[in-house]
Amino acid sequence: MANFKGHALPGSFFLVFGLWWSVKYPLRYLNSKVKGNCRSNKCYDRLELIEGILKALFSLIGILAEQFVPDGPHMHLVNGEDHSWVKLMNWQHTTMYLFYGISGVVDILTYFPLNLPRGLDRLSLGIAVIVEGLLFYYHVHNRPALDQHIHSLLLIAVFGCAISIMIEVFMRNDIVLELFRASLSILQGTWFWQIGFVLYPLGGAPEWNQTDHDNVMFITMCFCWHYAVALLIMAINYSLVYYCVNRHKKLPVIVDNGLIKINSKKAEVEASLLAGSDEE
């Protein structure tokens, strides 16, 4: 959709998944470092399954939104009267959602005992991100300078994310790569929203001059600010997860110490009773 909603929708999806990853991966990493932690990986496998279902569901919502909005193509690619293309921008967004939907289906299949190759879920996600980047690279040709530039900045986050995911295919459960991917996903989410605000101002806000070079300079600086905020969010979430994991780790120690004290007092009472009976 060539409007604000068409950018807010994918932005929301990327933001949700980026924020979720910024919590899930530190939680798994820090729990794995807890000595004597006997938790099974089944819990995290279920989370992967839920994540795959949500990814497929969000993709389906995106496809339906792009195709069946009032001014959408309604599954028509070619106009039957003059044989012209019908709403190719909507079709490009639909294609992007399609590949993310495939990634979600692969995540779901990975959960079941089908003996799928290890890393196939990451590979399918990496392909989806590459397709997204390819589509957006040819998305704004012959458009005003600011429009082209703001979309080209998005490609930095997209292809950076793709490279990270492709490395994850061979380096599974690497916390640095996972956090890097999460930060770039948050960046994609917030930047989609920024694109919407710049190209389609809301509430009667003044329109941006698409040919002013100062606007191009500001947008570049603004992109860096967005990533700084994404890194700040990552740091806050990691700190909160670290605090919660450490607090939970200390609870068994406190309980064990309490039981030791109770048992020692019980032993003292029994000893005193035995001593009293011996004297009698």
From Swiss-Prot:
Keywords, alphabetical: Membrane, Transmembrane, Transmembrane helix
Membrane topology: Multi-pass membrane protein
Record-stated family: Belongs to the TMEM45 family.
Any matching Pfam family: DUF716
Transmembrane segments: 7-27, 49-69, 96-116, 120-140, 150-170, 184-204, 216-236
Protein's recorded name: Transmembrane protein 45B
Cell compartments where the protein resides: Membrane
UniProt-listed InterPro entries: DUF716 (IPR006904), TMEM45 (IPR042127)
